[in-house]
Amino acid sequence: MHKRAIYPGTFDPVTNGHADLIERAANLFEHVIIGIAANPSKQPRFTLAERVELLKTVTAHLDNVEVVGFSGLLVDFAKEQNASVLVRGLRAVSDFEYEFQLANMNRRLSPDLESVFLTPAEENSFISSTLVKEVALHGGDVSQFVHAEVANALTKKAN
């Protein structure tokens, strides 16, 4: 089965939870595109170019994973990338309602685009980019939550 999947997100920064889901998706699909949303309304700490580079570092060992920045509608990006599946992560029940609404909107806009939900490993289920940034901002050690390169980048941003 030839399936191209997109795992979209802001990834500001990419966490071990994201990396876990990327590995799971890479085992399920022939080709996985990490679609990094420009998303200026979220006021990301890292630029789009920085987020792309960090994701490339984190996924360098995965031959079937590609990292691409994008802006605009996700369904349009999926069509440009010839992807038929969107991969989304669910950490807790609280994520489900938003993801359910998003999946239905995407299906309405692009009926052939299917959403697949993956859950992270238990040890990553509480990690969020927001929490990681908050810990780093206050000088805390985030090395157990992110790749070493990401931890270094966060330290540089905090100083």
From Swiss-Prot:
Substrate binds at residues 10, 42, 74, 88. Its cofactor is Mg(2+). It holds the Pfam family CTP_transf_like. One of its GO terms (cellular component) is cytoplasm. Its EC number is 2.7.7.3. ATP binds at residues 10-11, 18, 89-91, 99, 124-130. It is an enzyme of class 2 (transferase). One of its GO terms (molecular function) is pantetheine-phosphate adenylyltransferase activity. It catalyses: (R)-4'-phosphopantetheine + ATP + H(+) = 3'-dephospho-CoA + diphosphate. Pathway: Cofactor biosynthesis; coenzyme A biosynthesis; CoA from (R)-pantothenate: step 4/5. The keyword Transferase applies. It is found in: Cytoplasm. One of its GO terms (biological process) is coenzyme A biosynthetic process. InterPro entries: Cyt_trans-like (IPR004821), PPAT (IPR001980), Rossmann-like_a/b/a_fold (IPR014729). The keyword Magnesium applies. Its main location: cytoplasm. Gene3D superfamilies: HUPs. The record marks 18 as: Transition state stabilizer. It comes from the Bacteria. Homohexamer. NCBIfam families: coaD_prev_kdtB, cyt_tran_rel. HAMAP family: PPAT_bact. PANTHER family: PHOSPHOPANTETHEINE ADENYLYLTRANSFERASE. Reversibly transfers an adenylyl group from ATP to 4'-phosphopantetheine, yielding dephospho-CoA (dPCoA) and pyrophosphate. Belongs to the bacterial CoaD family. This is Phosphopantetheine adenylyltransferase. The lineage of its organism: Bacteria, Pseudomonadati, Pseudomonadota, Gammaproteobacteria, Alteromonadales.
